[in-house]
Structure formats: structure tokens, C-alpha cells
Amino acid sequence: MSETEVVFDRRMLEALICPRSHETLKYDQERQELISETANLAYPIRNGIPVMLIDEARVLD
């Protein structure tokens, strides 16, 4: 991790839910994504900010 890379604040998980399923999310540090197992979606984290848009989410395999 570089010095200029912004890190996701895990405390945000307490306030965030999946916009599709309205369920809690899991943080995938390696892929920098928030995972909704219920909706089968992964929301990207860009510059430490979660992008909670369904259109931006990746469908999980």
C-alpha cells in the first residue's frame, strides 16, 4: 500500500447497507469492495469511498 493510498474506514460498515437487499455488507480488503451476499453484488471502494450504486456493482460469480 502506498503512502498516498486512501484506506476505507471499517466503521462505515455500521452505517452502510446494500441498496438492493437492504442487508449488511462485508468488507473485502484485498479487492477493495463491499460485498452483499444476499444480493450477490460487490460494490467498489474508490479512494476510500464506497460507491453504493447498483449500476456500479459487480455481480459475484
From Swiss-Prot:
Disulfide bonds: none annotated. Pfam families: Trm112p (PF03966). InterPro entries: Trm112-like (IPR005651). It comes from the Bacteria. One of its GO terms (cellular component) is cytosol. Belongs to the UPF0434 family. HAMAP family: UPF0434 (MF_01187). This is UPF0434 protein RD1_0037. It comes from Roseobacter denitrificans (strain ATCC 33942 / OCh 114). The lineage of its organism: Bacteria, Pseudomonadati, Pseudomonadota, Alphaproteobacteria, Rhodobacterales.
